[in-house]
From Swiss-Prot:
NCBIfam families: gatC. HAMAP family: GatC. It catalyses: L-glutamyl-tRNA(Gln) + L-glutamine + ATP + H2O = L-glutaminyl-tRNA(Gln) + L-glutamate + ADP + phosphate + H(+); L-aspartyl-tRNA(Asn) + L-glutamine + ATP + H2O = L-asparaginyl-tRNA(Asn) + L-glutamate + ADP + phosphate + 2 H(+). Allows the formation of correctly charged Asn-tRNA(Asn) or Gln-tRNA(Gln) through the transamidation of misacylated Asp-tRNA(Asn) or Glu-tRNA(Gln) in organisms which lack either or both of asparaginyl-tRNA or glutaminyl-tRNA synthetases. The reaction takes place in the presence of glutamine and ATP through an activated phospho-Asp-tRNA(Asn) or phospho-Glu-tRNA(Gln). Its EC number is 6.3.5.-. It comes from Shouchella clausii (strain KSM-K16). Heterotrimer of A, B and C subunits. This is Aspartyl/glutamyl-tRNA(Asn/Gln) amidotransferase subunit C. It holds the Pfam family GatC. The gene is gatC. One of its GO terms (biological process) is translation.
Amino acid sequence: MSRISKEQVKHVAHLARLAITEEEAETFRNQLEDIITAAEQLNEVDTEGVVPTTHVLQMHNVLREDKPEKGLEVKEVLKNAPDHEDGQIRVPSVF
């Protein structure tokens, strides 16, 4: 017996505002059936003694520590800006 019907597939397609044919509904039903079967096989895997994890690799932040450092002076920044006014960098209008 099928765990998902063609009508359920058509209903979900309707909710997603997708127009699908009868043939597509049957194709998707078969594909979903295969996906459910594959997911159910995971329940059969023996996980006794396996520590539950939230990540595949037990890596922590491998980046350097954030340390505040003194940046450029405003004068230096404005010296490299193509256009500025009143201590602000002027950029082309976006809107």
